[in-house]
């Protein structure tokens, strides 16, 4: 049955794209062109290829159903439209401009809407990117702050999911919170030197609505809707099996202040520098992609809770076997905060400038594969991703360039500057706080969270990439009782693109 479901998912993802992805003009020729960079004057073509490949030109329309799976969000159902403008083909596999539209619904209660535009030609030597996203999570993961300093009661969660015990309460809402996030951004990237060194500047406007009616973490009526009575989450605080969500406990203990608890507006300017020598963007096989940027969100820009942060990321792609056959790739990232204060609701995000938009982290498909979503949050966080990518077959089908690839990987992260978790609540809550902190061994710092895994990818025209990956946290095998199973049991993903 699982094999049948996987086959149906693959068919829904791949067949529509193969049938519809036709361009206004395509030519078959030997690819032997120069290095690719970001802006128009530098974006030409990929590294030399020895085999004949179809060069895509004109417009390529890719409507397809959004059918995917994420262990953190559940089954994804929706629709996606990609529009690629390859121009005269001289940039292939990079585009002249492209549009991305998505409306997705997840079986665990999330909705995602995305409108994105990326332009490489309108402004000479400047790339222009603009994105609007709306994410509605009626039960978003929230495990607390500072990684292993916040204890995850995996044993009770496992017991609560025991379908054979109808008297056992379901425990997962303890680690959930309602969140609405609306993000808008416009970024510019311009050439400084030789189409390899660039400046970055952008404006980002983000709105976060946390919790339910400024009263509690969750809307229990919504998450219990259509559930059998014995499967409903306890919502009455006087019930014997009721468990107050961590979010509500953090408010009681003063870890999350009443001023910040229900979210706010973040209006920020981002400024940065970028160095990019990748041969192509969607699936690079050689080059360096490094950037550093500041996020400045002062009150005078309209920000509810001011913050000043920075991000440094270094990525490198090393060809072991040429022509995209075998590539070693890695990414190092550091997300930091100036000072000792930042609103808690911005901490999960891995910040970007350019065509991508901010992603939830650390934990999940786009950050640390195999670890629970948002498991690690702190004022400063360091992370790494290492991959070995093998493209084991290439061919042409229905005038499209097709390839399949395998990869093995390891991801890791840890908090390097703690979010303040000191007790600031009323004394009647002190005992519960002390008991909670003791569960993690009264730890005062985090340790590395590491995962390993492997995946398979379907690649079409170097840009459309479908990924099947499984990640496993090594904490499952730890002998330390304060570490074992704290990052989850592993996760399987069906999604698009490479992680980086």
Language-model-derived ranges and their functions:
Residues 29, 34-42, 131-133, 140-323:
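Transmembrane beta-strand segments of outer-membrane beta-barrel domains in Gram-negative
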Residues 47-59, 87-96, 122-128, 191-199, ...:
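Short loop/turn motifs that connect adjacent beta-strands in outer-membrane beta-barrel proteins
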Residues 59-61, 73-77, 95-97, 109-113, ...:
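Residues that define the transmembrane beta-barrel architecture of outer-membrane proteins
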Residues 60-69, 94-107, 113, 288-298, ...:
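Transmembrane beta-strand segments that form the barrel wall of outer-membrane beta-barrel proteins
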Residues 67, 79-81, 99-105, 130-138, ...:
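Transmembrane beta-barrel strands of outer-membrane/channel proteins
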Residues 90, 103-182, 333-362, 479-483:
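Outer-membrane beta-barrel translocator/channel fold
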Residues 259, 269-272, 280-398, 416-418, ...:
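C-terminal outer-membrane beta-barrel translocator/porin domains of Gram-negative envelope proteins
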